[in-house]
C-alpha cells in the first residue's frame, strides 16, 4: 500500500471523507488523493516522493509559484514579531492601499479570511445599503458556501430558488434567483419582472468553478446597465480571477466597473486572506460606521498580509501578466493541438493565468454547455496525466492555473505527456 493510500485511510477515520474540502477527495475522478509533502516553484512532491507539475496551485493563489523566495522572506520577517494580534497593524493599511491602487473601482476595502466571507459580507452589505432582499446569481458560478449562495434555479424564471445543499432552509433560498450565465434575455426578463426587489447581482466575470467559462462583453455590460438602472448593487466575485486575468482583474480586462468586488486567493499569497471593497458610499454602511455588521478575529492577520503584499508587489513587475498569459495560452493551444492530432473531441481556452479543458468540440459559454463534456473521457485523461506526473484539477468542473514558475521545460513535459495520453484515449 502506498503512503498516499495509508494516509487517506487514516484521514477517513477522523475527517469526514478524509479531506477538508470535498474536491480533494477525488470522488469525481476516482482513485486515491495525493497527499502533498512539499512544494517548490511549479512542482509538488507527494507522500510517496513522486514529483508532479502542479496546475492547481492551491486553486489559484500560487501565481508566482510555490515558496517564492520573496514571499517566504516576507513571512519569515514578520513571524518573530507575532502571529496574530486582534488589533490594527500598519501592514493592513499597506495592503489596503495596494489593493485600491491596483483595482480603481475599490475606494475602500475590508479584509477577511476567506472567499466565502468576502461574498457573504458583500451581499449583506448590498442588502443593508439598498434595503432589499433578493439577490441574483448565475448557474455554474460558485461564490462560497454561504446559505444564500448554495441555490439552484427553480422550474421557471420567476420561481423561487431551491437549495443545492442539505441544511439550507427554503426560506433562505427563496430570496435568491438563479439565471443562466451569459443569457442577456433572461437577465432582462428578470429585471423587468422584479428589478425593484433586487439588492444585488453577484457574478464571476470569468467563471472558474464550472471549468473556465468567460463572461461575454455583451452579458457583463448588460449587467452593469441593468443594475445601475434599477438601483441594484453589481458585485464582481473576483476571488478566483482577480489579479490573474489582468493586474486589475477581469474588470480591467473588460473595462467594466462594478460597485463591489470580492477578492481572495492571490491577495493572500497562499495564506488565508480575502477582501471585499468598492464604492465609498456603500462601504460606509459597514460597522463601525454603519449598521451592517461584519467582523473577524483573524481578519488582516499579519502573516497572511505579509505573504499577500509580497505577492502583489511581485506581480506588478513589467510584463508579468503578458508572460503569464502567453504561457497559459501556449498550454491550452498545445493541448488542443495534441487532441486534434489524436482525433479526440476536445477544446481548451485560456485567459490570463487561467485555463479550461473540455472534452467537447466547442468551448462552453454556459453551465449547460459544460455538462455536455465527456466526463468519463476526462477522468481517464486525468489519471493518464497523473500517472506521468502532471496534476490537473481532479474534476471536469474546475479551471486550471499557471504560475510564473511554469517554464518552457514544464510546458514541454506537459504536452509530451498529453500526446501519449490522447493517443491512449483514442486506442
UniProtKB/Swiss-Prot annotation:
Catalyzed reaction equations: (S)-4-amino-5-oxopentanoate = 5-aminolevulinate
GO molecular function per UniProt: glutamate-1-semialdehyde 2,1-aminomutase activity; pyridoxal phosphate binding; transaminase activity
Biological process, per Gene Ontology: protoporphyrinogen IX biosynthetic process
Enzyme class: isomerase
Pfam families: Aminotran_3
GO cellular component annotations of the record: cytoplasm
Top-level taxonomic group: Bacteria
EC number: 5.4.3.8
UniProt modified residues of type N6-(pyridoxal phosphate)lysine: 265
Keyword annotations: Cytoplasm, Isomerase, Porphyrin biosynthesis, Pyridoxal phosphate
Cofactor: pyridoxal 5'-phosphate
Chief location: cytoplasm
Coiled coil ranges: none
Pathway this chain belongs to: Porphyrin-containing compound metabolism; protoporphyrin-IX biosynthesis; 5-aminolevulinate from L-glutamyl-tRNA(Glu): step 2/2
PROSITE patterns per UniProt: AA_TRANSFER_CLASS_3
Gene3D superfamilies associated with the record: Aspartate Aminotransferase, domain 1, Type I PLP-dependent aspartate aminotransferase-like (Major domain)
Cell compartments where the protein resides: Cytoplasm
NCBIfam families registered for this protein in UniProt: hemL, PRK00062.1
Subunit architecture: Homodimer.
Family the entry assigns: Belongs to the class-III pyridoxal-phosphate-dependent aminotransferase family. HemL subfamily.
Name of this chain's protein: Glutamate-1-semialdehyde 2,1-aminomutase
